[in-house]
């Protein structure tokens, strides 16, 4: 029996919803997508697509739409009031609502949301105060207003439940660690689940036979070593702050840095509420760092353009420096361009370090290096710089400057490497591929729900 599945992805400044029809055990078919963005910088705007066709390109919405609950209510109203969207005419047409939850603690698979599940997610706010709080108000609204629908929590952390103990453990007192649930969890797991399946299909392999190094690069960025189709290691840790820098996140830094950065880091941030406790340290490293702190912008396109039109940010090591340097260097280089080059080079360095570490951790048995996420898909300059930096491991790009995420004729996975040129890696194995994957977290959540009999009332 066919039902409607809604996939809800609530961020700090936007709510995105994809609607699908599906039968149990079958692949979902997308019928609509709605996004409300700009919640933190009014006026917010709405974008609506139905059946792959743009219905509303961008429309400013009422000033009263100021938070995630308001945005979700507007999205639902948009769907129900569209007479041409025949599959959704009332709330009762919706069978399953799946919610992206960043931190799922020890959950290893999607969970049907009950009172017990919901209270457990509330308790996890202590571990992820800046992340889970965006999703829970919509979860609560859906549980109250959709009595005939099944609400399902899909966790960004669940994919990483396979990380071995020696990798996920922090070297601290283990009694305290167990009580406080202090260990590496990892995130972007819904995306990595999609990437693993899509890459395996592209390579003509079973997911259990695939070893890849995957990079989810967006305003939040992470890396993941995937061994036999399962997470082996990932750059994010207890929270999404660890690992790679992002638009406003520092990524991994010396843990004592923040205490030297400001004197009040242990105090609560003004952004805290009665139910949401955020320290100044968390606010500084999550909201006031990253490449925006270096350049003044969160737009990586601006950074990449400025960095790559001046000089290479990651020159290859040269044991014989140029004996004839420019006798007339620019005495007044543009400091803004210097900052952009610094941010670009810093990100390339951090990404390359994880690629190298994961290549070793996987014993050199790597089928592909996979770029995904908004920046991973669209920044040919970043891909080229990273691949050049890790070229000693056998990776090679094929000049994909024209691929900006919109090429590939709609393909989910595109080969941008030089596999066809032959060659081998350090171990004499065929050269690993360099791929771009258009990850789709909303689809992956809907697929998980469609395949699990429990969410259809038959498990």
From Swiss-Prot:
This is Probable acetate kinase. Belongs to the acetokinase family. ATP binds at residues 16, 216-220, 299-301. HAMAP family: Acetate_kinase. One of its GO terms (molecular function) is acetate kinase activity. Mg(2+) binds at residues 9, 441. Substrate binds at residue 100.
């Amino acid at each position: 029996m066919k039902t409607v599945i809604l996939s809800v992805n609530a961020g700090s400044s936007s709510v995105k919803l994809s609607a699908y029809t599906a039968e149990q055990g079958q692949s979902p078919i997308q019928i609509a997508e709605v996004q409300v963005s700009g919640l933190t910088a009014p006026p917010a705007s709405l974008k609506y697509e139905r059946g792959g066709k743009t219905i509303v390109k961008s429309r400013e919405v009422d000033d009263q739409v100021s938070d995630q609950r308001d945005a979700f209510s507007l999205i639902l109203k948009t769907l129900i009031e569209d007479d041409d969207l025949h599959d959704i005419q009332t709330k009762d047409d919706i069978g399953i609502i799946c919610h992206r939850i960043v931190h799922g603690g020890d959950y290893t698979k999607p969970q049907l949301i009950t009172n017990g599940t919901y209270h457990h997610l509330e308790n996890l706010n202590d571990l992820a105060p800046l992340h889970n709080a965006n999703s829970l108000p919509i979860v609560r609204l859906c549980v109250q207003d959709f009595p005939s629908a099944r609400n399902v929590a899909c966790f960004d952390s669940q994919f990483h439940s396979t990380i071995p103990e020696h990798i996920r453990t922090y070297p601290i007192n283990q009694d305290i660690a167990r009580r406080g649930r202090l260990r590496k969890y990892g995130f972007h797991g819904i995306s990595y689940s999609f990437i693993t399946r899509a890459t395996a299909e592209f390579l003509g392999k079973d997911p259990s036979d695939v070893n890849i190094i995957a990079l989810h690069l967006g305003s939040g960025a992470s890396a993941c070593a995937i061994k036999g189709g399962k997470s082996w290691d990932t750059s994010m840790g207890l929270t999404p702050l660890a690992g790679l820098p992002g638009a406003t996140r520092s990524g991994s830094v010396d843990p004592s840095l923040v205490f030297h950065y400001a004197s009040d880091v242990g105090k609560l941030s003004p952004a805290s509420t009665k139910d949401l406790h955020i320290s100044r340290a968390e606010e500084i490293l999550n909201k006031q760092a990253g490449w925006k702190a270096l350049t003044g912008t969160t737009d990586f396109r601006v950074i990449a353009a400025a960095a790559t039109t001046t000089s290479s940010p990651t020159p290859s090591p040269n044991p014989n420096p140029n004996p004839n340097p420019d006798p007339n260097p620019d005495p007044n280089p543009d400091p803004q361009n210097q900052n952009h080059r610094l941010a670009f080079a810093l990100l390339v360095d951090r990404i390359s370090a994880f690629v190298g570490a994961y290549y070793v951790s996987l014993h050199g048995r790597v089928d592909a290096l996979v770029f995904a996420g908004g920046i991973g898909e669209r920044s040919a300059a970043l891909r080229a710089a990273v691949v050049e930096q890790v070229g000693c491991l056998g990776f090679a790009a094929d000049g994909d400057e024209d691929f900006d995420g919109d090429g590939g004729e709609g393909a989910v996975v595109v080969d941008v490497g030089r596999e066809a040129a032959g060659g081998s890696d350090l171990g004499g194995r065929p050269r690993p591929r360099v791929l771009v994957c258009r990850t789709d977290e909303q689809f992956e959540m809907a697929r998980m729900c469609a395949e699990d009999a429990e969410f259809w009332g038959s498990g």
